[in-house]
């Protein structure tokens, strides 16, 4: 059991899990924290949770996306993470066209953000019912610095859709094939993916060109 999981058990004794989506919008500011408290275990980076939801029938653009995405909390320590996360609705309980994002503080989960502009993302499509477990596993891998690619990781996203759910991890430099390959291989390991799992990569520049997150991707095994 690693440090993140051990401290999770301690927090769960004190905090009850909220199962309502309303927690995202109502009275959420009381969770905000930007520096570790006394005696807490600091994360290597501060991380910010974001939430977005939109109507699929409406075409997406930069302005509407920025209006729909909401910053909900920033955490700086292992303890702060578990305290907030234990109140957060699980992705599998979200409805409609919704996304949770967890990014390094200061990086917006937008293709156009300076930290993301030259980057891209790995995409894993999940059948319904798996999103909550995979989301937690990829978060713990990122917070625990398991990817071993320096400052390349920007954040992770879980996207809830009607027919499938999608997990993605964003990195800064799409042209660095050594780094993107290492991220892919680490994803396979930490998520315990079968060898024949299809993984897709898409640069943010391509997403800007075709105004889509998950179409026209490059597929790899």
Q: Which residues make up each language-model segment?
A:
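Glycine-rich loop/turn
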Residues: 44-72
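Core residues of folded domains in eukaryotic genome-function proteins
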Residues: 43-47, 68-71, 118-122, 152-154, ...
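Long, polar low-complexity intrinsically disordered regions
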Residues: 1-44, 177, 191-194, 208-221
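Amphipathic alpha-helical interface segments within eukaryotic helical scaffold
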Residues: 94-161
């Amino acid at each position: 059991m690693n440090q993140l999981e051990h401290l999770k058990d301690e927090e769960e004794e004190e905090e009850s899990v909220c199962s309502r989506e309303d927690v995202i919008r109502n009275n959420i500011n009381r969770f905000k924290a930007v520096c570790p408290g006394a005696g807490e275990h600091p994360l290597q980076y501060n991380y910010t949770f974001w939430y977005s939801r939109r109507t699929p029938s409406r075409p997406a653009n930069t302005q509407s996306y920025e209006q729909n995405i909401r910053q909900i909390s920033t955490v700086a320590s292992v303890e702060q993470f578990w305290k907030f996360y234990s109140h957060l609705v699980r992705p599998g309980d979200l409805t409609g066209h919704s996304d949770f994002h967890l990014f390094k503080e200061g990086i917006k989960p937008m293709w156009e953000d300076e930290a993301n502009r030259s980057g891209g993302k790995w995409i894993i499509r999940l059948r319904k019912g798996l999103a909550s477990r995979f989301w937690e596993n990829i978060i713990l891998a990122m917070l625990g610095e398991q990817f071993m690619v320096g400052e390349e990781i920007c954040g992770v996203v879980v996207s809830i859709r009607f027919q499938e759910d999608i997990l993605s991890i964003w990195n800064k430099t799409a042209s660095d094939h050594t780094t993107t390959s290492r991220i892919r291989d680490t994803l396979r390991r930490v998520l315990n993916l079968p060898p024949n799992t299809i993984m897709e990569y898409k640069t943010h520049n391509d997403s800007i060109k075709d105004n889509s997150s998950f179409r026209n991707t490059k597929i790899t095994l």
